[in-house]
Amino acid sequence: GCRYMFGDCEKDEDCCKHLGCKRKMKYCAWDFTFT
């Protein structure tokens, strides 16, 4: 499944909807989208 906020990630696709991977810190964070 997808990674939630602050979950480990390698790329944006690893994260749940509305989350993007912060490559520098290697965690999922909100990508500023609502839809």
Swiss-Prot record:
Pfam families: Toxin_12 (PF07740)
An annotated GO cellular component: extracellular region
InterPro entries found in the cross-reference section: Huwentoxin-1
Localization (cell): Secreted
Keyword Secreted on entry: yes
Main location: secreted
Molecular function via GO: ion channel inhibitor activity; sodium channel regulator activity; toxin activity
Cystine pairs: 2-16, 9-21, 15-28
Tissues in which the protein is found: Expressed by the venom gland.
Alphabetic keyword roster: Disulfide bond, Ion channel impairing toxin, Knottin, Neurotoxin, Secreted, Toxin, Voltage-gated sodium channel impairing toxin
Domain statement: The presence of a 'disulfide through disulfide knot' structurally defines this protein as a knottin.
Function per UniProt: Gating-modifier toxin that targets voltage-gated sodium channels with a preferential activity on Nav1.7/SCN9A. On Nav1.7/SCN9A, the toxin acts by shifting the voltage-dependence of activation to more depolarized potentials, whereas it does not cause significant effect on the voltage-dependence of activation on other sodium channels. Minor effects are observed on the voltage-dependence of steady-state fast inactivation for all sodium channels tested (Nav1.1/SCN1A-Nav1.8/SCN10A).
Note: Negative results: shows no or weak effect on hNav1.8/SCN10A, rKv2.1/KCNB1 and hCav1.2/CACNA1C, hCav2.2/CACNA1B, alpha-7/SCN9A nAChR, alpha-3/SCN3A nAChR.
Family statement drawn from the similarity comment of this UniProt entry: Belongs to the neurotoxin 10 (Hwtx-1) family. 28 (Jztx-11) subfamily.
Protein name stated in the entry: Mu-theraphotoxin-Pn3b
